[in-house]
């Protein structure tokens, strides 16, 4: 079956309609209008103008569809046939006489819509329209809350035994069990070969403090280190107890012989004649005499064994000679005098310790005065311990001799004081807010105990 295009079908319908209208016999049999309208032959005879007044064919019942693309090549032969028929139908028509006007023809189809005119004014509010049709069903709603659980149903029958599952993972480690009984002691193994010496291990952690051991022998004196900072003066200590009296020293040398006494009074006259006999031998030496070491002995002076200043005054039994500070500290004799060879000075022992007797000597006794001007020339010569070429008494060389504690000159950077040389320090500057006089210890440290604060 041949399927025709809608446009081609419309054209065929028009041609079919025209062919039917052109047959007068068919029209008369269907619509008897011969009385009302003259036939085509009558119009041809009536005048030559009748042919020219033929009405155009009616418009098609179905308007052709609108095609945006080009025309189909199938329509070209039909259109050519239509044009040929129209030319053949109009070519023999001769202009005839004007006939009577015919009846009005049927109303044609509505024309194409015109252009949209300008927007008119807003009309009155119309009546409310009818109720529209129900819309499409809406989207299903969200599920509601879970309802209460229903009653528990009857228990079902036991199902068939399932297949054995895979082995599970290893469980956690259990708790440690109780220790077992101690086994029997094994036999002693053979002694193995001596292994190679291992590397030295790291030093271990310090152990616990052990008990204090016995005091070992005194070592050799070490090198003098740097002097530390001066500490704050401590509080005055309590008065110590008086020590035991020392051992009686050896007796002194016998003193010089005394002056001969005055001659006694003459004896009674002898009964007979006095004859001078020969001189006798020299007698044995007498005991050593007593030395009071004081003023001339008389009846007002005390006898030997008593102090010149009374029985309560202390006495100095003997003078010791030491080489250095260590030997001086070993002497425990109370109220004694010692001579230090290294410093060439005397020290006295009382309740406070060993104190120098010569506080501010200009120079030791064996210091020789420079008579030739050789000391201070910077050249070390016989008899000089040092020669720094200056006259500064605050360094380690004073008048060509080494400085030491007790020479009366403060060695800067080494000694806090020396004798009465405090380096321009007083109680006011050493302890602000105090007053009094500073003291210098036998070790050339400042003693601020005499300083007092205002109350």
UniProtKB/Swiss-Prot annotation:
GO molecular function per UniProt: extracellular matrix structural constituent conferring tensile strength; heparin binding
Name the segments for region: Disordered: 90-282
Subcellular location, in the record's words?
Answer: Synapse
Bias regions of kind Pro residues — which residues? Answer: 101-112, 134-152, 262-271
Q: Effect of altering residue 342 to E?
A: In CMS5; impairs anchoring to the basal lamina
Q: Where is this region: Heparan sulfate proteoglycan binding?
A: 130-133, 235-238
Coiled-coil region(s): none
Q: Name one Pfam family in it.
A: Collagen
| Signal peptide extent | 1-22
Q: Where does it mainly reside? A: other
Record's keyword terms, sorted: Collagen, Congenital myasthenic syndrome, Disease variant, Disulfide bond, Neurotransmitter degradation, Repeat, Signal, Synapse
Where is this chain compositionally biased, Basic and acidic residues type?
118-127, 182-200
Domain named Collagen-like is located at 96-269, 277-291
Q: Which GO terms describe its cellular component?
A: basement membrane; cell junction; collagen trimer; collagen-containing extracellular matrix; extracellular space; neuromuscular junction; plasma membrane; synaptic cleft
Comment on protein domains: The proline-rich attachment domain (PRAD) binds the AChE catalytic subunits.
Please give the PANTHER family that the UniProt record associates with this protein: ACETYLCHOLINESTERASE COLLAGENIC TAIL PEPTIDE (PTHR24023:SF861), COLLAGEN ALPHA (PTHR24023)
Q: What does this protein do?
A: Anchors the catalytic subunits of asymmetric AChE to the synaptic basal lamina.
UniProt similarity note: Belongs to the COLQ family.
Q: How does it assemble?
A: Homotrimer. Component of the asymmetric form of AChE, a disulfide-bonded oligomer composed of the collagenic subunits (Q) and a variable number of asymmetric catalytic subunits (T). The N-terminal of a collagenic subunit (Q) associates with the C-terminal of a catalytic subunit (T).
Linked pathology is: Myasthenic syndrome, congenital, 5: A form of congenital myasthenic syndrome, a group of disorders characterized by failure of neuromuscular transmission, including pre-synaptic, synaptic, and post-synaptic disorders that are not of autoimmune origin. Clinical features are easy fatigability and muscle weakness affecting the axial and limb muscles (with hypotonia in early-onset forms), the ocular muscles (leading to ptosis and ophthalmoplegia), and the facial and bulbar musculature (affecting sucking and swallowing, and leading to dysphonia).
* Record protein name field: Acetylcholinesterase collagenic tail peptide
Record the organism: Homo sapiens (Human)
